[in-house]
């Protein structure tokens, strides 16, 4: 099982988001604990030799890295689709 960590940007976004949207996003992110690369995630590139994935959550997107050696999923950024990239 993996541990899900949020970057400061991701935490700040969730703090400003409405409660029902925040709950929906957090529920989807919890699923990454069991399977860090689900079939509905997409590889979008590399940063510092680490793969970056996109996870779709309705109109929102979460960008994240999987750190296999320490079993951590690091959520880099969460935002609406046009702004996340």
Predicted segments with their positions:
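Enriched for short, Lys/Arg-rich terminal
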Residues: 1-8, 12, 20-23, 57-60, ...
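A generic "cationic amphipathic patch" detector
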Residues: 23, 27, 38, 45, ...
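A short, surface-exposed loop/turn module that caps and links secondary-structure elements
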Residues: 30-54
């Amino acid at each position: 099982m993996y541990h899900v960590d949020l970057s400061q940007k991701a935490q700040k976004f969730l703090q400003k988001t409405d409660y029902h949207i925040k709950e929906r996003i957090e529920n989807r992110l919890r699923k990454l604990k069991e399977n860090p690369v689900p079939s509905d995630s997409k590889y979008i590139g590399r940063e510092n030799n680490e793969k970056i994935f996109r996870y779709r959550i309705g109109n929102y997107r979460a960008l994240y890295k999987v750190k296999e050696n320490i079993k951590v999923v690091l959520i880099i950024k969460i935002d609406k689709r046009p702004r996340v990239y």
